[in-house]
Design a protein with these regions (language model features):
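HotDog/MaoC-like acyl-thioester-processing domains
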Residues: 1-11, 104-156
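Non-catalytic linker/capping segments at the edges of enzyme domains
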Residues: 1-53
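Short acidic/polar alpha-helix capping motifs at helix-coil junctions
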Residues: 11-15, 63-66, 81, 91-95
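Hydrophobic residues in beta-strands and at strand termini
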Residues: 43-45, 102, 148
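Hydrophobic beta-strand-centered segment that forms part of the acyl-chain substrate-binding groove
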Residues: 72-113
Length: 156
């Protein structure tokens, strides 16, 4: 993809997250993009991300859904305000609630494809629905409630 990922717009002090921080050399460094009204993310688990041979660890799945969904919440908030990502003041979101439904075991060996849509934007809250598929088969669904980071959480 030629465009910048949502996470590449985060200011430095918001770029250290294990799941999505571009400055976390040990992290997952997921990347999320718009595809029309949905956001997309493709992530290939490493062999050590296994629960048992042949299947992806559920905690990793929750982490990827979490970070992709909060990035989507931020991108949607910028869109709702008619702003370009990366403009000041920065809009960054954290997880208030995460519900994950594991529909089928998630196989290793192929990228995880995440597709998210916005269900609601209300004040500081954004509700994001995410579907995770492997090779076209939906394996996991998630619903995340994200809230805008208060200024008190920002280390400057």
């Amino acid at each position: 993809m030629g465009e910048k990922a949502f996470q590449e717009y985060y200011p430095e002090h918001f770029s250290h997250c294990y799941g999505c921080g571009v400055l976390n050399e040990h992290g997952l460094r997921i990347k999320s993009y718009w595809d029309g009204a949905e956001s997309v993310c493709s992530f290939r688990p490493m062999p050590y991300h296994t629960s048992f041979p042949g299947f992806v660890y559920g905690g990793l799945i929750a982490s990827v859904i979490d970070c992709h969904s909060t990035a989507t919440a931020a991108a949607a908030a910028y869109r709702a305000e008619g702003r370009t990502m990366g403009t000041e003041p920065p809009l960054r979101y954290v997880t208030a609630s995460l519900k994950v439904d594991y529909l089928h075991p998630t196989p290793m060996g192929s990228p995880l494809e995440l597709r998210s849509s916005i269900r609601e934007i209300k004040g500081r809250k954004v509700v994001v629905e995410t579907r995770l598929s492997v090779d076209g088969k939906e394996c996991v669904r998630g619903e995340l409630v994200a809230v805008r980071i208060p200024d008190t959480m920002v280390a400057r």
